[in-house]
Amino acid sequence: MSDAAIADALAARGFALAPEFLRPDEVAALRGVALQRRATGEFHAARIGRGAGARRDPALRGDEICWLDEASAPERALLARFEALREALNRALFLGLTALEAHYACYGAGTGYARHLDRFRDDDTRAISLVLYLNEAWRAGDGGELRLFASEDAREPALVIAPRGGTLVALRSDTIAHEVLPARRERWSIAAWLRRRSDADALR
């Protein structure tokens, strides 16, 4: 799926699915970097909330994370690709996206992430969320699906996505609720957010 098609899907439905956003060799390279960084102790348990109120709650969120940087060639290439997508979305949708942040996420067997929105109630800067999967040979029985809901109150998912390597999911951070179902094996991904200036900053 082209960047233009991702923009069209976001405008029409609030989410987009790009099954072959990265090639298998690119996925393998990023997974290798993630495994190496985890082996050197760079991952830590994720928290929910932000600031002083952030807390660890494995019943709600069970992943370990590590923020991407530009120390390796695979990470630099991916961040450049995300930057190109950010620019394309700005051209097509006039979103005013100004920044990007991204981290690896590793869910152990039996862990998931309860239904939530990515935009914090007291921080409106997250505009578009991205999820890129790094798993190899993911099978139907492995679980770990991402379920997207068209609104915060929707009862049934609009889309259920298997976390197959190379697949990219883009969604609106403010309206598309989502959850990660528990997996039966380790589940690897990269989560990223395209950010804009806050409404409060824009009024200054």
What are these regions (language model features)?
Residues 1-129, 133-168, 174-204:
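Fe(II)/2-oxoglutarate oxygenase catalytic core
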